[in-house]
């Protein structure tokens, strides 16, 4: 709301709800940390100049980077050995939603001077472009990779109508 209106009344609320997410910066078991912190701390840093948010952004990039699988060139979205994801037989599932994390990695690279974050984001984007899109430019929800060889194992959906259907939310993020 603050970005949209510029009305200062929104700042205290934005800061309160942002700072409630402080512990998220240390999570390494899923990819959502990038957009959770990007939509909160990164926006707080950009719009309100909150210098104290910089370390949180950088730490989140470090945590997210632990999900990078170099042989496949992607950030693994979900752990494949727990919950419903384990039932799918995936090894390194990557969802198109993961593209939302790249902004945080690019910004963390600028803020920290560490090009590792930039390189991970760029490689993930390039790999996604090569493997997530169909001839008609619609995208798969999930592409499962072999984390050791980088080969694509499966192209599926976890939330869409069918494996070969376009998922509106994923298309928007792509």
Positions of predicted regions on the chain:
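Glycan-recognition and catalytic cores of secretory/periplasmic carbohydrate-active enzymes
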Residues: 1-173
């Amino acid at each position: 709301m603050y970005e949209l209106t510029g009305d200062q009344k929104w700042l205290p609320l934005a800061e309160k709800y942002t700072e409630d997410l402080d512990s998220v910066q240390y999570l390494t078991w899923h990819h959502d940390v990038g957009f959770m912190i990007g939509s909160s701390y990164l926006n707080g840093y950009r719009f309100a100049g909150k210098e104290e948010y910089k370390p949180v952004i950088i730490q989140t990039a470090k945590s997210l980077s632990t999900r990078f699988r170099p042989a496949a060139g992607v950030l693994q979205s979900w752990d494949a050995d727990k919950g419903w994801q384990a039932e799918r037989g995936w090894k390194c599932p990557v969802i198109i939603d993961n593209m939302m994390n790249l902004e945080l990695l690019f910004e963390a690279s600028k803020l920290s001077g560490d090009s590792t974050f930039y390189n991970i984001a760029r490689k993930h984007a390039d790999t996604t472009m090569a493997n997530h899109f169909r001839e008609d430019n619609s995208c798969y929800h999930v592409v499962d990779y072999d984390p050791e060889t980088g080969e694509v194992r499966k192209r599926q959906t976890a939330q869409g109508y069918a494996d070969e259907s376009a998922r509106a939310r994923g298309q928007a993020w792509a």
